[in-house]
Structure formats: structure tokens, C-alpha cells
Amino acid sequence: MKLPLWRLLIAVTPLLTSLASAEMSTEVARAGVAPFYKALNAEFATDSADLIRQATAPDWVSCRGNDVCNSREEVIAGVAARLKSVPDLTWQIKDVLVSGNQVTVRGEATGTPAAEFFGTAPTGKSFKVMSIDVHTLEGGKMVRSYHIEDWIGAVRQVTAK
């Protein structure tokens, strides 16, 4: 017995829709972004460029505003500079949320600046701040990221009297 094409389409549409919108698991998402966050830790400073390249697509961009984005190589240079100015920097993944191919990471950065830090001289004081990052993953690699860190709060903490 042959089914009319329209009946076949009606029958398989729910299956195709569920496959197209299937979310990656939290574990897969965490594994995809983990090398990037590892790269933000002073302990892995010598490997940070390779770790960032491992986690990102060649044309990945990281945006700190709607229209202010940096290329992968610019981010690698920025991370290297940050790790020099905060030689004990640690960055932990605190929470991971997944929606389709978007991964939101709530993170926490801590460190003690040893060089100029957002225009302030080192004081010997440490900071602890939250970060929120939204990454789009394709093929297990980050292709676009939006991020917010509380750097004003960090400066307040290291300059507090």
C-alpha cells in the first residue's frame, strides 16, 4: 500500500522537527567550551593560545558589545596580556545552560593584579568577579561568543581603601 506524499510528510514532520531542534547535552556543551576556560587560567598560560584554538573555529569572534567583536587571534593576544598582568588568574565554570546550539556559561574569575589593571597600579589586593558568556557552537567549536565580565567591580575591589 502506497501512502500519499502528503500523509508521509505529515507522519515524519514531528520526527524531523525534533531532530532539528535537538539540544546538545550539558556534558557535551561543557566539553566544547572547557578548553577555552582552561586557557584563561594562569596555570595554563603557556598553552592558552593552543587551548583557545582547540575550542574555537578559525573565524570565531568574541564580542564584548553588539558591534564590538575581536577575532580569534586578537582574543589570544588579549588573554596573553591579561595573564601577564594577573599572573595568578583563575577562571572557573560555575554553571552551564544549553539552548539548541547556544551555551551560556556563568563563570567566576579571581586574581591579584601584578601590573597595571584597567588603568590602576597594582595594590596587592585581589578581586573576584562573575562573568556571563553566551557561545554559539557548531560542530563542537565556538563560532561566536558574547561576554560580560564585572571588570568595574574588579577595579573597585583592588582599589578599595
Region roles according to the model:
Residues E27, A31, A49-Q54, P58-G100:
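A solvent-exposed, acidic/Ser-Thr-rich amphipathic alpha-helical stretch
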Residues R7-S18:
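Bacterial N-terminal signal peptides
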Residues V143-K161:
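Low-complexity, intrinsically disordered terminal/linker segments enriched in charged
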Residues V96-T104, T136-M142:
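A short, structured loop/turn motif at beta-sheet edges
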